[in-house]
Amino acid sequence: MPQMINLGSEMLRITSRGVEYSTSSGRIWSIRYMGTSCGTFVDLLPYGSEILAVTSKGIYYSSNAGRSWSLRYMGTSCGTFQNLMDGGKELLANTDKGLYYSTNGGRTWVKRR
């Protein structure tokens, strides 16, 4: 499960303090986001012009390299999200209830049969 991603000249990672970034190939890290309103960050995924995040409160997205986050999905019918994957034409998610997919950037989810 990627807890560190590359965004061009920056790297982002999840730590116990929140989301950190590095512009020095990982030699020096600084806090990018340490708010608690999103819950605890679990996984990050670059997805088009956004970053998607699995958190303890749902799926969040950032369109400014992780400086701020907005809720994308908070439903409970899929179970607890564990990680996200870019499946090309669809977004895939492992949850404690199985594999789910989304064709609209994570706004709605359908169980893979």
Regions found by a protein language model. Give the residues of each.
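Repeated scaffold domains used in trafficking and secretory/extracellular systems
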Residues: M1-G8, C38-G48, C78-G88
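Hydrophobic beta-strand positions in blades of beta-propellers and related beta-sheet-rich domains
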Residues: M11, V19-E20, I59-Y60, L99
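Short loop/turn segments immediately following the C-termini of beta-strands
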Residues: S16, S56, D96
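Conserved Ser/Thr-centered positions that define the repeating blades of beta-propeller domains
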Residues: S22-T23, S62-S63, S102-T103
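Short coil turn/linker residues within repeat-based beta-strand modules
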Residues: G26, G66-R67, G106
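Surface loop/turn motifs at the tips and blade-to-blade linkers of beta-strand repeat domains
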Residues: Y33-T36, Y73-T76
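Blade-level signature of beta-propeller repeat domains, shared across WD40, Kelch, NHL, RCC1
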Residues: D96-R113
